[in-house]
Amino acid sequence: TPEAALIELLGRVGARLGESVTVSTEELSQWPAAAVSALKSQGLLLKARPAKSVICDGCEQDCSMPVQTVTRANGSVTSFVVCDKRSDTNRVPVPAARLALWRCDAQAVCGFIAASLGLQQTTVQPSEVGLLPIGMARGNKRTQMLCLRVHGHLALVVGTNAMPLADVIGIENGGFTLDHAVLHQMVDAATTADRQTRYAGWQKAYKALRKKRPNESDVWYSQQIAKTPIAQGRDASTIKKHMLA
């Protein structure tokens, strides 16, 4: 099913801790056409550089061989492998379709989530390994930072609450969607650090910034902290007030 194809792709990205994974055009031809079309149009599959090696089909030995490409004067391109195992085989042509690759990584997944939920994707840098900020998500009661966790499997994280990304994915009108209602519930139900713990985090960040950039103003320090997940949506003036306490 289309959902199964997306879950398979997300599982591979999670297994590589968010790093880029590639899928060949040959493999994609075995996936549901609707899934492949949606994955490409929604930015979850992006063009990758052509494969540098292939399994040679010149004989039954199925050797993995490097691909050589020649561009002729008229602009036409020919790719092939050179067999060094058999005396009766030399160049084995490789169709361009066999070399085509598509890629997906955690950043592409974050972009898909932001677009699906109508979020402005944040420029906040990760403050924790394996936890990527996506954007400020609104519930019915509060607004909090939505993040993507990439440890082993992909999960949406709000505050201390987490949910596997695969559990909130569906397909509608030929495109992949996220369950907005469930996400709103996550935002409203998320428990964040208590007030004193939050203030302590700001004070620690303030001291670290002062040590790194000693000649900046307190306003500048508070503005930098406001761009990080530990701000929890608070503005710079609120942070400044409590980081100096």
Give the residues covered by each predicted segment.
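Low-complexity, PEST-like segments
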Residues: 1-204
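K/R-rich mixed-charge low-complexity regions
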Residues: 170-245
